[in-house]
Amino acid sequence: MNVIEVKNLSKKYKELTAVDNISFNVKEGEILGLLGPNGSGKSTTINAILSLIKSEGSVKLFGKIMSPENYEVKSKIGVIFQEVAVFEELTVLENIDYFCGLYIDDKKERTKYVMDALELVHLEEFKNFYPKQLSGGLLRRLNIACGIAHKPKLIFLDEPTVAVDPQSRNNILESVKNLAKNGAAILYTTHYMEEAEMLCDKIIILDKGKIIAEGTSDELKSLTNIEEKITIESENIENKTIEKIKKLKNVEEVTYLNGTLLITYTKGKNNLVDLIEFLKANKIRYDKIFSERPTLNDVFLELTGKELRDWCLPIILNTL
């Protein structure tokens, strides 16, 4: 079942088109990653889906047209924005209980939900702490617990791991995976390519408000012309040798700096084998050699013009 159905969604700010006629679906238990440079339209897309801003096109959530007054649909949604939104005067436990109570009236049921949320983000030992006593990573985990305590079937996560410690980051990613395993549909925005690669079932790359690529991580990697990067550590590679390497089959680019030779290949087979044979034939000694396949970051940089553009777009961070 499609939990999110977006068709021909657009949003304009005077002369600027922030979201340009995009369409996509998200199913139950699926994690969709939205990637793009700053100002590419990620946050605007979320705000439009949630009816926090007016837009053109069609948005259906759980098969129903989304609108600001559709409280039945809103009760099934959890939203975790990048900015932490909790009450400083309440403890961790009280904060989660408050936000859960906006949806769950029954006290016994709510208590169970709150404890489940605490366990999900591993904050049990901090339940009586106040927000000011928590690290940045723990605060973000609290923020997530508050957003998902009522067990929503659709969850929006906007850059949830920005500026957190590695332990909290791993915990957050584990929590997101568990939420999807339990059937929640998740729309996840991030700047971290490795997160999207590890976490998301499908990925959409946005640039200038348009979808420029979508698919699984492997499908997106197949779009890049870069097939392989080989790095060689050697202090005795002459310019004439570098010129010969540039003429080898499938070689796209060669750079040599401070004893490190980096060779970028286009698609092709046996690149590493051919290179080693060349080095042996030319009696070139080297200390280390290793190969690296293209990453999602390579795809992202290639498709978006290899620069992260900052636009001045208004970002509306209202809560539901």
Question: Model-found features: residue ranges?
Answer:
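Conserved ABC transporter NBD signature motif
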Residues: G57-P68, V73
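Conserved ABC ATPase signature
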Residues: E89, Y130-G137
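Catalytic Walker B motif of ABC-type/P-loop ATPase nucleotide-binding domains
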Residues: I155-E159
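ABC transporter nucleotide-binding domain
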Residues: L173-T266
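Walker A (P-loop) phosphate-binding loop of ABC-type ATPase nucleotide-binding domains
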Residues: P37-G41
